């Protein structure tokens, strides 16, 4: 369960004939409006994120700092019928609000997570659309970018230890892949994209599912690297993960 946070403010709004709300961090943002979650509103201050995702993220230059705007989009076959609407189960159950609060909880536990700034949803009868604004981490490269660039600084052991920390706190990451692991110039590892993530009692089944998903991601982006090379790198990560887990860290 995510703890109550006194720094959260929920502001209802109307957009045309639609109702919605914005949940935001009042220490980072003084005023909010629906336009913050619309790429066109930013004009030349919005730049599409080229890596990962479904064409649903933008870097934005704001008075409250550089941020990432991400609109929630569906993937797979269902996206052909319904690209960005989800079934309404109440404002507190929208994907943007759940992710915002989960990220704040993880930060409170000392985990390397970028700061969520604001979450938005707009209701359409029994459906809704959603978006989220997150602090941009400057100078970072994804694990996928490091691999494709043949970087020698992939920090496999450090990544393994980081994942162990998240699992120790009970985070079941719904999409652990090479695009969602970031490395900054100081060598710090970060984890992003907590949509559909959840805090659970640490258990082998979901931890192994997370790691298996990461391995599939590494194999998918291997390019000219051999399968054996991918498995060797992953084994380095896995050994560090297992050691950290056995030590309770």
From Swiss-Prot:
| Protein topology in the membrane | Peripheral membrane protein
In the UniProt record, does the keyword Nuclease occur?
Answer: no
Which GO molecular function entries does the Swiss-Prot or TrEMBL record give?
Answer: ATP binding; kinase activity; phosphotransferase activity, alcohol group as acceptor
Q: Which major enzyme category is it? A: transferase
Pfam families found in the cross-reference section: Kdo (PF06293)
Identify the metabolic or biological route this protein is part of: Bacterial outer membrane biogenesis; LPS core biosynthesis
**Do the record's keywords include Cell membrane?**
yes
Which HAMAP family does this UniProt record tie to the protein? KDO_kinase (MF_00521)
What protein is this chain from?
Answer: 3-deoxy-D-manno-octulosonic acid kinase
Naturally occurring in which organism (per UniProt): Xylella fastidiosa (strain M12)
Q: What is the lineage of its organism?
A: Bacteria, Pseudomonadati, Pseudomonadota, Gammaproteobacteria, Lysobacterales
């Amino acid at each position: 369960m995510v703890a109550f946070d006194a720094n959260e403010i929920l502001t209802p709004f109307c957009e045309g004939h639609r109702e919605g709300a914005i949940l935001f961090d009042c220490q980072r943002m003084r005023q909010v409006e629906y336009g913050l979650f619309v790429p066109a509103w930013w004009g030349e201050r919005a730049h599409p994120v080229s890596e990962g995702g479904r064409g649903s993220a933008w870097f934005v230059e704001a008075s409250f700092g550089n941020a990432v705007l991400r609109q929630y989009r569906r993937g797979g076959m269902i996206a052909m019928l319904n690209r960005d609407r989800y079934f309404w189960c109440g404002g507190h159950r929208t994907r943007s609000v759940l992710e915002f609060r989960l990220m704040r909880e993880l930060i409170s536990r000392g985990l390397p997570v970028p700061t969520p700034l604001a979450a938005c949803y707009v209701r359409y009868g029994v459906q809704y659309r959603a978006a989220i604004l997150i602090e941009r981490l400057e100078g970072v490269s994804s694990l996928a970018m490091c691999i494709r660039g043949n970087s020698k600084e992939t920090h496999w052991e450090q990544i393994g230890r980081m994942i162990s920390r998240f699992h120790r706190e009970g985070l079941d990451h719904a999409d652990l892949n090479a695009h969602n692991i970031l490395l900054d110039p100081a060598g710090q590892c970060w984890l992003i994209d907590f949509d559909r993530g959840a805090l659970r009692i640490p258990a082998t089944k979901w931890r192994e599912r997370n790691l298996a998903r990461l391995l599939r991601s590494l194999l998918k982006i291997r390019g000219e690297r051999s399968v054996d090379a991918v498995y060797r790198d992953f084994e380095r990560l896995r050994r560090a993960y297992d050691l950290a887990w056995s030590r309770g860290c």
